[in-house]
Amino acid sequence: MSGLTLRQLGFENGPLDEFSLPSDLVVSTAVDQPNVVTIVLAGPSPQTVEDHLRATLPNEGFTIDARADAGEALTFEGNGWTGGFTGTGATSAIVLRPV
């Protein structure tokens, strides 16, 4: 499953080469700070983003800690960062924080 890394998306903070998102993403809002990286997506669907994360995070050095039984939500950590993903309707968000 191919995607774009944070570096390819123009971010200066976060696990720049170790974290990716679907290549057809539509960024609605983004925060790029040393202490937090937040990305709100208007597309693709939250299910597509979650599927991408579940398929790529382990290969990128992350461990998925928890996943919601209902709906799109998960937490993960690795490469010196913790992260969370949630989605509802057509919108989803990722938050990354350094450990």
Language-model-derived ranges and their functions:
Residues M1-V37:
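Compositionally biased P/S/T/G-rich terminal and signal peptide-adjacent segments
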Residues R7, F11-E18, D65, T82, ...:
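Intrinsically disordered, low-complexity, compositionally biased regions/tails
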Residues V26, P46-T48, D69, W81-G83, ...:
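Generic "edge-of-domain/loop-turn" microfeature
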Residues T29-V36, D65-G71, T86-A90:
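Short, ordered beta-strand-loop transition motifs
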Residues P44-D65:
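Amphipathic alpha-helical segments
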Residues P58-T82:
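Short Gly/Thr-rich strand-loop-strand
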Residues A73-A90, I94-P98:
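Short, exposed beta-strand-loop hairpins at the edges of beta-sheets
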